[in-house]
Swiss-Prot record:
It comes from Pongo abelii (Sumatran orangutan). The gene is MKKS. Residues 198-370 are annotated as: Substrate-binding apical domain. This is Molecular chaperone MKKS. It is found in: Cytoplasm, Cytoskeleton, Microtubule organizing center, Centrosome; Cytoplasm, Cytosol; Nucleus. Pfam families: Cpn60_TCP1 (PF00118).
Length: 570
């Protein structure tokens, strides 16, 4: 069939960052992500023009998945951030804001993209080396033998998501539950390479947050009538389990384009049922106590198994198959033929449970590396946001188990890092440039743009007109409320720095963020007594933050290096 209209030529635009449309698009995107940042970030409601589901969030994962992006440059930016978030769960907004700030700041400089990219790479390498070094002044070790730092981690994630709508008491309760759920996934007698279990989040919407709880094992939601039909099992030893990933309904499988030849007088339904009953007889002879099926079990097979005191539960769904396999040690059975003895697994016990208006069949494991977090919240919107936040917190703990270090949060790492870069580029530029073709003047310009981008991320934490200061000893962030007097004694207005490590009773000098000041050496090597005495720190995941920093700089470099954008308009 011929085309109804002629094919349009592709649009080719050179120097895309110089166009007003691109700058406006990036500016709008920056304002969106900046306004969401931090504990007092503003919420966003996203929905399509045809109505339907409305997403209320301030999290980057939900925000970017619901945000329709059409411009190629913005697609590069959002895709990079989404890839980072899918791998690390945390620091998505940090990455987005830093990337936008870097692009915006260097555009004001009269430097070639090649020079900017080369120096950005040098500064990124300097940041990563410092944050991984023993002398880093914003990195603390994480002791998994103590719950204090771990609770700080979880609490920091929860308090940064205002759409969860948690009170302080609820935050403490959910933090403790998340930590307990994570610890339950760690094998007790693990040596060498550790394989973590899994935490399943079970929804209980419309309930009080304080009613949330954690149980070892897996909860299978069922109706009250179904639970009443299940026979109780009284056994002193473990219960033998068979897990089926194929249908046990007796339906004839789809033959595709093939032909099924059936002899005269043979009933396919009866033949299929006979095969199912033969399978049931093998399960009985193998002393199976519990049959779980991903799909449907034929009513006759169910009744047959129940007569022999075997519990049969169907319609488990694909989501629970992997956790059930891990917890029970079964190999999912995919055929109706003879079953290998190695396919069976076991559970310690089973029982019924009721939470709110929901009824569950509770599988209790032999070893608790699979657990269920029953998560409650007042409404669907708050629950959806809390679920995402809990998943992020659990992932952050997993990342920290691999690399047991934390960065000071609340903006203190960014201001400390900016102070360190300024000092390093002013006092030891040769160590950064080495044999590079760039000059010290170019380094100073890019370093200031880089530090300003970091400080702009920190500035995004303030949404209510307050001021942000940094001290001249540690390089930490300090917040002043909007209604504070213009001329005041700073120690009277400042209580703690952003991360909560230092208080204003020390003899410190402060200056406004982004004000002109002489570069200084921020104190490195955190004293252990300072970290040990702090009980309510705000912390960031080192692994996620380093990745976010790297993704932001590399994505900014990629966008700055674009010479042409070619769009197919057909």
């Amino acid at each position: 069939m011929s085309r109804l209209e002629a094919k349009k030529p592709s649009l080719c635009k050179s120097e895309p960052l110089t166009t007003e449309r691109v700058r406006t698009t990036l500016s709008v995107f920056k304002r969106i992500v900046t306004s969401c940042y931090g504990p007092s970030g503003r919420l966003k409601q996203l929905h399509n023009g045809f109505g339907g589901y409305v997403c209320t969030t301030s999290q980057s994962s939900a925000l970017l998945s619901h945000l329709l992006v059409t411009h190629p440059i913005l697609k590069i930016l959002t895709t990079s951030i989404q890839n980072h978030v899918s791998s690390f769960s945390d620091c998505g907004l940090f990455t987005a804001i830093l990337c936008c700030n870097l692009i915006e700041n260097v555009q004001r400089l009269d430097l070639t993209p090649t020079t900017v990219i080369r120096l950005n790479k040098h500064l990124l390498s300097l940041c990563i080396s410092y944050l991984k070094s023993e002398t880093c002044g914003c990195r603390i070790p994480v002791d998994f033998g103590s719950t204090q730092i771990l609770l700080c981690f979880v609490r920091s994630v929860l308090t940064s998501k205002p759409a969860c709508m948690l009170t302080r008491k609820e935050t403490e309760h959910v933090s403790a539950l998340i930590l307990r759920a994570f610890l339950l996934t760690i094998p007790e007698n693990a040596e060498g390479h550790i394989i973590l279990g899994k935490s399943l989040i079970v929804p209980l919407k419309g309930q009080r947050v304080i009613d949330s709880t954690v149980l070892p094992g897996i909860l299978i939601e069922m109706s009250e009538v179904q639970l009443m039909r299940l026979l109780p099992i009284k056994k002193s030893t473990a219960l033998k389990v068979a897990l089926f990933c194929t249908t046990l309904s007796g339906d004839i499988s789809d033959t595709g384009e093939g032909t099924v030849v059936v002899s005269y007088g043979v009933s396919l339904e009866n033949a299929a049922l006979d095969q199912l009953l033969n399978l049931g007889r093998q399960l009985i002879s193998d002393h199976v106590d519990l049959v779980l099926c991903q799909k449907v079990i034929h009513p006759s097979l169910k009744q047959f198994l129940n007569m022999h005191r075997i519990i049969a539960i169907d319609r488990i769904g694909v989501t629970l198959m992997e956790p059930l396999t891990k917890m029970t040690g079964t190999q999912p059975i995919g055929s109706l033929g003879s079953i290998s003895p190695n396919s069976y697994g076991s559970v310690k016990d089973v029982c019924t449970a009721k939470f709110g208006s929901k009824h569950f069949f509770h599988l209790i494991p032999n070893e608790a590396t699979i657990c269920s977090l029953l998560l409650c919240n007042r409404n669907d919107t708050a629950w959806d946001e809390l679920k995402l936040t809990c998943q992020t917190a659990l992932h952050v703990l997993q990342l920290t188990l691999k690399e047991p270090w934390a960065l000071l949060g609340g903006g203190c790492t960014e201001t400390h890092l900016a102070a360190y870069i300024r000092h390093k580029t002013h006092n030891d530029p040769e160590s950064i440039l080495k044999d590079d073709e760039c000059t010290q003047t170019e380094l100073q310009l890019i370093a200031e743009a880089f530090c300003s981008a970091l400080e702009s991320v920190v500035g995004s934490l303030e949404h209510d007109g307050g001021e942000i200061l940094t001290d001249m000893k540690y390089g930490h962030l300090w917040s002043v409320q909007a209604d504070s007097p213009c001329v005041a004694n700073w120690p009277d207005l400042l209580s703690q720095c952003g991360c909560g490590l230092y208080n204003s009773q020390e003899e410190l000098n402060w200056s406004f963020l982004r004000s002109t000041r002489r570069p200084f050496v921020p104190q490195t090597c955190l004293p252990h007594e300072a970290v040990g005495s702090a009980s309510n720190l705000t912390l960031d995941c080192l692994t996620a933050k380093l990745s976010g920093l790297q993704v932001a700089v590399e994505t900014a470099n990629l966008i700055l290096d674009l010479s042409y954008v070619i769009e197919d308009k057909n």
